[in-house]
């Protein structure tokens, strides 16, 4: 029977045998058991998929696979030192086990949960026998430092560094002090409760409340309810990015819901109908919210692919502020009784607006403070009016956490399995996969006419294709789909002197309206040596810092270039090819016509659009019966169940009410806003490059031209800017 539901039978048998041996111990330190010593070549009882998480394993098995494995390695090293000194740590619970639990108290992986549970069971079994170290040893005033290899890189170290790279400490959402602070008055052996389902939430207790079971501190006024973390931890085939930002949430719409619609007289193509709400939402759906430019450089210069695996979200240090006016003086003070309301739409009941390239994301520069965007949505319309199927949602109909100053909110999410993003370019072209030294054994139709003296007669002649006839060789694969776009030149004088961005654009027609095919299917931006050209609506265009929203000049925007995919994808501004359009016979010659748009065909292969440091991470795949290769056209990962929207609002507090009853609803509220910090931790799985290529690769670097400025930094006014988009396809692979 497991002890307190934690102790498995095999561990109970092992501990029982150890207790029997303890009764027979002689004075002096117990001698270590020969089988208990770590051997560098021993496998031990390691959990499948791990290198160190388990007893009796070796200490030299390479890099830990994740944070739980790294904690297990440090624990094993501590046990090894105790065995060398003649102590036997297997027969007691000491500081090594306590530190192992402390380090993994926020780890929700299977290995982390199992490791904490095993040591908690060990502690409870050994407590009645007096084999648990005193608290002064178990929880010292300063936390035991984690040993690091002298070659361990940090988030700014160079790429390709040799030697072991031990895992660094993960973001500790429950930690209330820095690494040298006095620990919380909670027994270190108490494990946190693991998330039970998507969208699980935790609210810390208020000031003066006791410590919670899951190690959330008594986060009241005067005590921080979390710490600032902005870094990347590189763990072999994983990287964990952590971003913290400061947010501000105003009171939107004076706590009202409002209809919104297109203005009267608007063109039919621009009609809409929807609602604005008093709620805000958190948007961190851009890569530069999580990766610094240097970490992005390390990512794309060392990996052929990556994909997101897990996400942890936390709101902390929440402060509700009250604004008052008195004789022209504005006073801002903490309101300790007002609340904010927070919930996650884990069932995707609300219209999903993330992934639509909206402003309002976490800023790329950690020192910048941002405003939480207001949530609004569109529903079905006829012109500027609603129809019978139009939907309205009251967000107060959803259960929410009510948080005061000093409380916090956490949420965990696991990404669905998606393919790795291909962060490489091809070093071959789809039409050049053959051996150039020999002929094919297949024949092709070479001629339909032959000359006999001065006479020409119809005759079918066939030949084998070889090195001098590459275009005639049989091939297995076709390039990807095509939806042709108009070509523009970055040199204005090369373009027609007319206003044609809409009239000459490639569009599709849906529900009585036209929309641009923007950016459309992934296609190459231009042919070789034609860098000045780009498709009119076939690229992503980002604005530089401070660029006007309307009529921005070319030098104030950043246009992406998908030239690397021309090895498999058509050029967006060129025809796909030619196709026969008649039946030839003895009296009718054959004719062809251009193909300007080509859908998917069997045998087609192509590359998806690249992702960019400034671009989106994911988009929600629409809830439909059918879909074909739903890779978002703006780049990123297509997800059926993406990270849910996290909604937040300031709870209304009525202003001074009248002394007599009124049936009218309140329309006057005290002026409030809220602020605090938000941390987002994402674990990414990496596909390491292992090319056998001999000559050097092209890699991303910042010294692409001579410059007197430093890129990706602040100016004299403290404004941070990103001078160019950074994609991912610099390394190469064969087709």
List each model region and its residues.
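Extended terminal accessory/targeting regions
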Residues: 2-154, 170, 177-178
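Capsid-like jelly-roll
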Residues: 139-735
